[in-house]
């Protein structure tokens, strides 16, 4: 059974600036993440930033496992 959560990083280029996370949904395969996050970004820097959104599986013993990921940016290469 999975213990999923979502982690969102605000990035400028390759540099991670700020992180937000959802609560962990214990023992579920069909979580519903109804969350909103806000980041303070100066308007003149908005085109330089991106959001790295990762769905993770929490693990008490070992390393948390990446389930899925998307990078939201003006231009992704």
What feature does the model see in each segment?
Residues 40-46:
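Short, surface-exposed loop/turn segments at beta-strand-coil junctions that are enriched for proline
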